[in-house]
Amino acid sequence: MERFDAIIIGAGAAGMFCSALAGQAGRRVLLIDNGKKPGRKILMSGGGRCNFTNLYVEPGAYLSQNPHFCKSALARFTQWDFIDLVNKHGIAWHEKTLGQLFCDDSAQQIVDMLVDECEKGNVTFRLRSEVLSVAKDETGFTLELNGMTVGCEKLVIATGGLSMPGLGASPFGYKIAEQFGLNVLPTRAGLVPFTLHKPLLEELQVLAGVAVPSVITAENGTVFRENLLFTHRGLSGPAVLQISSYWQPGEFVSINLLPDVDLETFLNEQRNAHPDQSLKNTLAVHLPKRLVERLQQLGQIPDVSLKQLNVRDQQALISTLTDWRVQPNGTEGYRTAEVTLGGVDTNELSSRTMEARKVPGLYFIGEVMDVTGWLGGYNFQWAWSSAWACAQDLIAAKSS
């Protein structure tokens, strides 16, 4: 049986980065993945350009039942540290919006960078490999793979969550946690589009493809200012993806479709200047024409001129456009979700090393645990930071 200092399961962002760091410090590392190629989710991210971090990373941008857990790792390995690595590899990047950093060229550059870093650390890759069983003994862990048995002193689980099953997502990491007696919190899809109840969906389907700036608010008071997109299945766009992580089934969200307009002042000014202008054409100055026309067809916008718009109808219109209350039917689920909420309970782990408190030598990094970031590079930064924190402990174990 071949033995390694550390075996890392999952050749995604966290798994590759942790492997590279430990390998370059002299640890003998085996990196296992069930896919044909490493970094499959990286390649799909950011429209193929990988939103690899965010300039404004802070603990408040992460959801967890233990909101303090992420602070240590994020402080010890920051976005600036990862940007330095990207720069060292000569990868050109740009800020798109709200601090989101993307490769100028392709997400493949980030995968190639991580593979190169792993090669520098003499990391052994074993792809297309299924872990059939994991057992612990006095020397560490023994893993049965399809075709071989391997052993290690330290075992790192970096298998991610349940989002995007088409890219190989599975509950493997949760099962390992449960096998060793660790609590796993209920999971659900996060950063995911909303589906709508049939009557509302049928009313809005003709708007598929229409995008508008918005401010969207969850019942718990969380607010995001981002674009909203109407789709054939419901609502999407950055605003909806962000708020979906804070939404619970049965709840409403409030949507302001005119976040940059004081609608009452605008209507009064336009009435004074153009009293005979139709309300529809007036609103089309700030809203997509297709949206205005559809809302008028649905009776949400009166078919009147500005001088005919009475006070009661104006107030109702303002409420419709700035406090549109929508009760989603649900979400599109893990198939299109960018992340998984919940997972391995962080109270079971050391925030400094990511090691299981009750199982020495067993670590969890990245999305598999109950830490979920906002849209915009935050989840990649958690992968880098948690991987770095874990790697430091793997390195310290070797030196000691």
Residue ranges and their predicted role:
Residues 154-200:
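Glycine-rich loop(s) and the adjacent beta-strand/alpha-helix scaffold that form part
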Residues 49-95:
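Glycine-rich active-site loop/strand segments that organize a redox cofactor
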Residues 7-9, 131, 150-166, 177-178, ...:
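Short hydrophobic core segments
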Residues 2-14:
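Beta1/beta-strand and adjacent pyrophosphate-binding region of the FAD-binding site
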Residues 7, 23-47:
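Glycine-rich FAD pyrophosphate-binding loop
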Residues 76-154:
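Feature captures the FAD/FMN-dependent oxidoreductase FAD-binding
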Residues 127, 293-372:
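A glycine-rich dinucleotide-binding beta-alpha-beta segment and adjacent secondary-structure elements
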Residues 36-38, 43-44, 52-59, 92, ...:
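An anion/pyrophosphate-binding glycine-rich loop and adjacent beta-alpha core
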